[in-house]
Regions:
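Surface-exposed loop/turn positions within long extracellular repeat scaffolds
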Residues: 222, 241, 264-277, 284-295, ...
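Asparagine/serine/threonine-enriched low-complexity, disordered tracts
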Residues: 53, 65, 69-74, 93, ...
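N-terminal segments that cap or nucleate solenoid repeat domains
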Residues: 24-105, 435-493, 581, 649
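Sec-dependent N-terminal signal peptides
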Residues: 6-13
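Tight coil/turn sites that cap or link beta-strands
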Residues: 38-40, 49, 59, 70-72, ...
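Glycine-centered low-complexity coil/loop motifs and glycine-rich tracts
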Residues: 42-51, 72-88, 99-113, 124-145, ...
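Extracellular/surface-exposed low-complexity segments
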Residues: 3, 15-35, 262, 283-294, ...
Length: 650
C-alpha cells in the first residue's frame, strides 16, 4: 500500500475516534508534540466513571500535551446514585482549552469536572462540578481539583450543588495559580461551597469570585492557607443566614484594588465579616479604589502559633465599612495613610495593636482595649513637625483598661534612656496622641533629648517655656539638654529662656534663633554645636576642652561673654556684645570674624586662640602672651588693644 495512503488512513482513524460521540469512559492519548487535539463530539461517562481519561507520553509536560474541547461540546462524568460521580476530564500533565462545557457527574457526592495534577486550563466557557445527591454529609463536586494547576478563566467555573449537604468548591487543591476574568463560584447547599479553596494559592481576580449560597452558612469566596490575592474585581462571601467571608485562612497576603465583601444582612443593615485571618503572618494593602464591606477579624492565636496582620493604607483608601476585631494573643500593625473603620475596634486579652507616630491615624466608631491588651507605639519619627500626632481617634470614645499597657519604643533613643515622647488619651478620651514631653503639663514635662549613635532627630516645632508646676525629675521647664552620641537638629525658631547644654553628640541649628533666648550655652568634652549658617543670640558661652563650636557661616552673639576652652571652627562671625569672652582653645581652623563691641572684652593668650580670623574691635582686646607671638591676624576698629604677659609680640 502506498505510504501516503497509509498515513492518510491512520489520520482518518484518529480523527474518527476523536470526533465520534461516545457514552462510557474514553481515553485520549495526547501526542506530546505541542499540537492541540480537538474534541468535537460530546462524551458522557457512565456508572460514576470519568467521561474522559487523558494519557500522555512519558516525560512530557503540560505545555506539550494540549486538548481542546470545541464549542457546544459537553463532557460529563458518569452519574452514580451510591458513590461519587465521575470526573468530566481526568489526567495529568496536559493543557485543556475549554470552549464547551465540562461537567462532573452527579452522585452521592458530586464528581469533579476537571481533576488531576500539573494541569493548565484555559476556560472560555463553562465548568460545572457535579451535584451531590446524598443529603446530609454529602457534597457537590468541585469545578477544578488538583495540585500544581494553572487556571486562566474567562467565563464560568462552578462548584456543584447539594441541597442536603455542602456545595462544592469552584477550584480546590494546592499550588494553584488563578487568573480570573470571569466568574468562579462555590456550589449551593445547606452549607455553601467555597469559590476557591486550598493551599499555596496565587490569585489575580479581575471579575467575580463568590462563595455559594447556604441554607445555614454561606460559603467563603476564598479560603485556605498561604494565599496571595491581587484583587481588582469583586470577592464576595456566599449568601445565607450566616454569610460567608470574602477571604478566610492563614498566611494570607492581599493587595486590594477592588471589592471584598461579606454577605449584606438586611435585618441588621450591616455586612457580615468580610475577612478572617485565622493564623500565621498576614498582610492587607489597601488602595484608593479599595472597598471592604464587613469586619476584619483576627482569630485568637492557635496553640503554639501566631497570628499577625499588617494593614497598610497605600494611598488614602476609602473607609472600611466595618470594624477590626483582634482576638486573644493576635497582633495588628497599621501603617501608611490614615485608616478609617466605620465600625468598632476591639482588642482582646494579650492582643496588641501596633502604631507609628507620624504614620497612620486609625479612626473608628468605638475603640476598646480589654484587660491585658496592649498598644505598642513606635515613636521613632525622625522629623517632628507637629505639636502632637494623633494615633487613634473615635466618634464615641476610646476605652483603655490599663494605661500602663501603652508601650513606647524608639530606635532613635539611646538604649535605657528616658523618652522625650509621651503618649496618652486626650482630655475627652476620644483621641490617643503622642507629643513631645517638653510640652506636657501633667507631670511628665521633660527637656532632655538622648539620641542614639548614628541616629538623627529633627525637631521642627517651636519650643517655648513650659510653665506647668508639674514637671518631671527636676526639669525647670525651660532648659534643653542634648545627650547621647547621635544628632539633634533644631529647625524651628524657638522661644525657651533657659540653658542649652550639649553633653555629647551633635546639635545642629537649622533656623534663626533656634537656641531661643538661651541663658547659658554649655558644650561638654566630645560635644559639637553646628550653627549651619544661621544667626543665634545667647547670654553666655561656656565650652569645655575637647568640644567643637562650628560657626559654619552663621553668627553667634554673646551678650555676656563666657569661657571657650574648646575648638571654634568654620567661618562666620562671633560677636561679643557685653562681658568678657576668655578664649583658651585651639581655633586654628576658624577663619571668620571676632567682633568686640563697645564695652565688651575679648581675651586670648596664643595665636591659635584667634586662628586666622579677623578681629573687628570696638571694645577691648587683650593679648596675654607668655611666649613669642607673631601676630598675623587683621585687626580693625577703634577699640583698645592690651598686651600682657612676658612674651614678645611681633
Amino acid at each position: 500500500m502506498n505510504k501516503n495512503i497509509r498515513i492518510l488512513q491512520f489520520l482518518v482513524s484518529i480523527l474518527y475516534s476523536v470526533q465520534s460521540h461516545f457514552s462510557g469512559a474514553q481515553t485520549i492519548q495526547l501526542n506530546g508534540n505541542g499540537i492541540p487535539e480537538s474534541i468535537t463530539r460530546s462524551i458522557t461517562g457512565v456508572d460514576g466513571n470519568a467521561a474522559l481519561n487523558i494519557s500522555v507520553p512519558y516525560k512530557t509536560s503540560y505545555t506539550q500535551n494540549i486538548l481542546s474541547v470545541e464549542s457546544s461540546i459537553n463532557i460529563k462524568g458518569g452519574t452514580s446514585n451510591t458513590s461519587i460521580g465521575g470526573a468530566g476530564v481526568y489526567g495529568e500533565n496536559f493543557t485543556l482549552n475549554n470552549n464547551g462545557s465540562v461537567w462532573g457527574g452527579d452522585g452521592y457526592n458530586g464528581g469533579i469536572a476537571v481533576s488531576g495534577n500539573k494541569i493548565s486550563i484555559n476556560n472560555y466557557r463553562n465548568v460545572y462540578g457535579g451535584n451531590g445527591l446524598g443529603g446530609s454529609g454529602s457534597s457537590g463536586g468541585a469545578g477544578l481539583s488538583g495540585d500544581d494547576i494553572i487556571v486562566d478563566n474567562y467565563r464560568s467555573i462552578y462548584g456543584g450543588d447539594d441541597v442536603g449537604g455542602t456545595g462544592g468548591s469552584g477550584v480546590t487543591g494546592s499550588n494553584i495559580t488563578v487568573h480570573n476574568s470571569g466568574g468562579i463560584l462555590g456550589g449551593n447547599g445547606v452549607n455553601g461551597g467555597d469559590g476557591i479553596n486550598g493551599s499555596n494559592l496565587f490569585i489575580t481576580n479581575d471579575n467575580m469570585i463568590s462563595g455559594g449560597y447556604g441554607i445555614k452558612q454561606g460559603g467563603d469566596a476564598i479560603s485556605g492557607n498561604q494565599i496571595t490575592l491581587n484583587n481588582n474585581g469583586i470577592v464576595q462571601g456566599g449568601y445565607g443566614p450566616d454569610g460567608g467571608c470574602s477571604v478566610y485562612g492563614e498566611d494570607i497576603h492581599i493587595n486590594n484594588h477592588g471589592n471584598l465583601s461579606g454577605l449584606y444582612n438586611s435585618q441588621k443593615d450591616a455586612y457580615n465579616t468580610s475577612i478572617i485571618f485565622s493564623g500565621g503572618y498576614n498582610s492587607l494593602d489597601i488602595y484608593s479604589d479599595s472597598v471592604i464591606n464587613g469586619d476584619i477579624k483576627l482569630a485568637s492565636i492557635p496553640v503554639n502559633g501566631t497570628n499577625e496582620l499588617i494593614i497598610k493604607n497605600i494611598n488614602n483608601a476609602t473607609a472600611i465599612n466595618g470594624g477590626l476585631m483582634i482576638g486573644n494573643g493576635s497582633s495588628v500593625y497599621l501603617s501608611g495613610k490614615n485608616s478609617i473603620f466605620n465600625g468598632n475596634i476591639s482588642i482582646d486579652e494579650d492582643a496588641s495593636m501596633n502604631l507609628s507616630v507620624g504614620n497612620a491615624n486609625v479612626h473608628a466608631n468605638t475603640i476598646t482595649l480589654k484587660s491585658d491588651s496592649w498598644l505598642n507605639i513606635d515613636t521613632s519619627i525622625k522629623n517632628w513637625t507637629q505639636d502632637y500626632y494623633t494615633l487613634l481617634s473615635s466618634d464615641t470614645g476610646i476605652s483603655i483598661a490599663d494605661n500602663s499597657h501603652i508601650v513606647q519604643y524608639n530606635v532613635l533613643l539611646t538604649e535605657g534612656a528616658e523618652s522625650y515622647v509621651y503618649t496618652s488619651l486626650n482630655d475627652d478620651d476620644n483621641k490617643l496622641i503622642s507629643m513631645l514631653r517638653w510640652n506636657n503639663t501633667k507631670g511628665m514635662g521633660y527637656g532632655t533629648f538622648n539620641i542614639e549613635k548614628d541616629a538623627t532627630l529633627n525637631i521642627g516645632v517651636s519650643l517655648s517655656d513650659n510653665l506647668s508646676p508639674l514637671l518631671y525629675d527636676g526639669w525647670d521647664g525651660k532648659s534643653l539638654t542634648k545627650s547621647g552620641n547621635g544628632t539633634l537638629i533644631l529647625s524651628a525658631t524657638n522661644n525657651y529662656t533657659g540653658n542649652t547644654e550639649v553633653k555629647s553628640g551633635v546639635l545642629i541649628l537649622a533656623a534663626p534663633d533656634a537656641l531661643g533666648r538661651t541663658e547659658y550655652l554649655y558644650l561638654s568634652r566630645g560635644a559639637e554645636l553646628d550653627m549651619n549658617g544661621y544667626p543665634q543670640t545667647i547670654s553666655k558661652l561656656l565650652t569645655a576642652a575637647g568640644s567643637v563650636l562650628n560657626i559654619h557661616g552663621g553668627s553667634l552673639i554673646l551678650n555676656n561673654g563666657g569661657e571657650s576652652a574648646g575648638t571654634i571652627a568654620g567661618d562666620g562671625s562671633l560677636n561679643i556684645n557685653g562681658g568678657m569672652l576668655d578664649i583658651t582653645g585651639n581655633n586654628r581652623n576658624f577663619s571668620g570674624v571676632f567682633t568686640v563691641n563697645k564695652g565688651a572684652h575679648l581675651a586670648v593668650s596664643t595665636a591659635d586662640n584667634l586662628g586666622t580670623a579677623f578681629v573687628d574691635n570696638y571694645g577691648t582686646l587683650t593679648l596675654n602672651s607668655t611666649s613669642a607671638w607673631q601676630l598675623t591676624n587683621n585687626i580693625s576698629g577703634y577699640g583698645n588693644v592690651r598686651k600682657t604677659g612676658a612674651g614678645a609680640l611681633n
